[in-house]
Amino acid sequence: MGKRIRPQRLGRGGPTYRAPSHRYRGRIEHRPYDEQEKKGKVVGKVVELLHDPARNAPVARVRFEDGEERLILVPEGTKVGDIIECGVSAEIKPGNTLPLAEIPEGVPIFNIEGQPGDGGKFARAPGCYATIIAHDVGRTYVQLPSGKVRTFDPRCRATIGVMSGGGKREKPFVKAGKKYYHMRSKGGKWPKVRGVAMNAVDHPFGGGNHQSPGKPTTIARGDPPGRKVGHIAARKTGRGGRR
């Protein structure tokens, strides 16, 4: 009997394969959509920029005029001491949060709500932004970073600007240790060893004098977890012949 393979250990959900969420800053979203925002604006000040292990972009701690402190996503160029406004009468300026109906066409935005008051669901990745294409009665057309155009309720809020943290993927890791700790912070397991490179006790494709599966790589849908590796329930494999 061989050892349990990686998919079996991952499915068990032990601490090795769980994301260390106890280190995360928590939910990062817009402030509650209250009457103060619907009729005017709320003003806050950036008091601190923080690193969040859960994401690749910095987050800002903002202290609002009523004394409330909240972590929010901020655009490129934000610094400690900047003033942030939230509400229908907020100024059209990077970092401010307004309903889509109040934002002109062509302005870059991020952290867009899917439903009014849900805190933000779209365009939250580092360095990304969406663009308002057009306003219509009861709907706003927004082009997402993927290029897809989606309609939103005009009451949904968004933050003006380009999401901070851009260029993250352009910087090389250089060292394997950095890549390991980066993956570990999100619960990823790295490096991922190939089955044919393992010993026979560790994987069905392991062992032998040279690296090869040594058996058919197609596997039935109902086979047990310890054997279920390779092409699962494949209708065909390979490139196929030209007809």
UniProtKB/Swiss-Prot annotation:
Q: Which domain of life is it from?
A: Archaea
Q: Which GO terms describe its cellular component?
A: cytosolic large ribosomal subunit
Recorded GO MF terms: rRNA binding; structural constituent of ribosome
**Region of interest (Disordered), residue spans:** 1-23, 204-243
One of the GO BP terms on file: cytoplasmic translation
Biased composition regions of type Basic residues, renumbered to the chain: 228-243
| Pfam families to which the protein is assigned, alphabetical | Ribosomal_L2, Ribosomal_L2_C
Cross-referenced InterPro entries: NA-bd_OB-fold (IPR012340), Rib_uL2_dom2 (IPR014722), Ribosomal_uL2 (IPR002171), Ribosomal_uL2_arc_euk (IPR023672), Ribosomal_uL2_C (IPR022669), Ribosomal_uL2_CS (IPR022671), Ribosomal_uL2_dom3 (IPR014726), Ribosomal_uL2_RNA-bd_dom (IPR022666)
Q: What does this protein do?
A: One of the primary rRNA binding proteins. Required for association of the 30S and 50S subunits to form the 70S ribosome, for tRNA binding and peptide bond formation. It has been suggested to have peptidyltransferase activity; this is somewhat controversial. Makes several contacts with the 16S rRNA in the 70S ribosome.
Q: Which family does it belong to?
A: Belongs to the universal ribosomal protein uL2 family.
Name of this chain's protein? Large ribosomal subunit protein uL2
At the highest ranks, the source species' classification is:
Archaea, Methanobacteriati, Methanobacteriota, Methanomada group, Methanopyri
Tell me the name of the encoding gene.
Answer: rpl2
